[in-house]
């Protein structure tokens, strides 16, 4: 985005994809547990546009307490995302570097998302979400 909040034309496709994903999350929000803090995992989070947007939707717009973990292979990207999260004082957001197969969440996720995961990461994300019996997988 530009300083005035305009989406750059080179990023308009990604912007539309993330907004569509947020529509999906909004549509299934009632299927997520309402009696506790939601546990969310974003596999292959990359620069975490979806991770931050999901947090905003759940925590700020839907007023649903949530704890979100973004996982990605690239340590440099994870460090940048963690820095941004810390600067924004988003304590319920955390980022980890690693492989999907080696990730162990603090508690079973209610929502697992994965947008454009590379190689076999989409298959790995689906398999892991099913194994954890996540309420919703997108």
Identify what each model region corresponds to.
Residues 1-38:
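Conserved Class I S-adenosyl-L-methionine-dependent methyltransferase catalytic core
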Residues 47-63:
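Conserved SAM-binding loop of SAM-dependent methyltransferases across substrates and taxa
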Residues 66-72:
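Conserved SAM-binding motif I beta-strand of class I
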Residues 76-109:
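S-adenosyl-L-methionine
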Residues 101, 110-122:
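A short SAM/SAH-binding and catalytic strip from SAM-dependent methyltransferases
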Residues 119-131:
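A short, conserved alpha-helix within the catalytic core of class I
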Residues 133-138:
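Conserved beta-strand signature within the Rossmann-like core of class I S-adenosyl-L-methionine
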